[in-house]
Amino acid sequence: VLGHVLDRNPDLALVFPDYYLVDPFGEVYSHERRKKLYVDNHSLDTPPHGACTLIRVSVLKEVGGYREDLKAQDGFDLWSKLFERYKLTNVNLPLFYYRQHGSNLTANSHRIFDARRQIKMDHIRDKLKSLHPVIAVIPCRRNFDFVTDLWDEKIGGKTLLEREIEVCLSSELFDHVVVASDNPLTEETVRKYSDDRLGFVLRDSQSTIRSASIVPTLESVVSRFSPELSGITVIRYLQAPFVKVDSIEEAIATLVMSGADSSIAVEEILSQVFRRTRYGMEPVNPRGDFRSDFDSLYRDLLCCVATYSRNFRTGSLTGRSIVSYVMPPAECMIIDTEQKLQVARVLAGGGH
């Protein structure tokens, strides 16, 4: 079937099918379907399952073949080399069975995360040279959190702000790291660091209320370095203290690689979600034997946003086109209650 598609369409470089998911006992429990590329699906940020993908040998040779230095995600690497240069397609027929069990490579998340990030960074390294400045903004506020001056709370012997500053400064991708706060005392923390990339901006207290958009603050910050609002801005929320620098850099890489307006960290919602109707509750993501990639629901982890600074001109944080990436579960904790703050202190060690 796949060979026939390539034979009839010489302009195509790659084709892939739908597939069945099979449990450890050999029972089919789901038909995984991908919406038709270029017709119903115009976002090519998600590669196909690599178990049954047909590619022209000539094209495979042109792009250098599969990488042998990767321990996982070689299919994603191949996809990253193809989707911008060649025409690809998919067939809505399930042509293979995929059995999921604990020993699948898919279950080895660390290898997958590391390989995926390496592929993305290698892919965008040259592109990033024309996208400066890359600015990290760490917003802080005195009020409107569950505790006053949340940024000054300590976990693992350091304040949340100190932890975030050090993580951002550890990345060579950032030209500037800016702390924006309505409390002048925040600047004292900033002054502890000698890195020339680090700066402080005093923001208006009215901009910190929950109903206020953060975009005017971001536009003001970025305009200091780029009046024309060029480059990329990354918003890092210190309420997520376990996010590592690799995940922050992946936000940038995902954005640049995709051609979208912004990228966010998400988590797939695996449990059922309901909405209220006139007749009671209705499932938004009904479970069944047949599902497509459009049936999945995701929640914003509120950890990190990478966006092109030009979006601020229209008052938008994300722009119209948003892509996502998955963050390791250990990094996803958000401190928005006193209880979670205490849990974070236990996880970080070192008490206050």
Description of each model-found segment:
Residues 167-174:
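Short, acidic, metal-binding catalytic loop of nucleotide-sugar glycosyltransferases
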Residues 18, 27-46, 50, 121, ...:
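Short, flexible, basic/aromatic active-site loop/helix in glycosyltransferases
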Residues 26, 216-220, 229, 238-331:
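Conserved core of the sugar-phosphate nucleotidyltransferase
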Residues 17, 31-117:
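Conserved nucleotide-sugar donor-binding catalytic segment
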Residues 185-234, 242-246, 250:
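Short phosphate-binding loop-to-helix
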Residues 1-29, 225-230, 253-265:
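Conserved donor NDP-sugar-binding/catalytic core segment of glycosyltransferases
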Residues 13, 68-70, 80-97, 124-131, ...:
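Catalytic donor-sugar/metal-binding loop of nucleotide-sugar-dependent glycosyltransferases
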Residues 129-148:
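N-terminal nucleotide-binding beta1-loop-alpha1 segment
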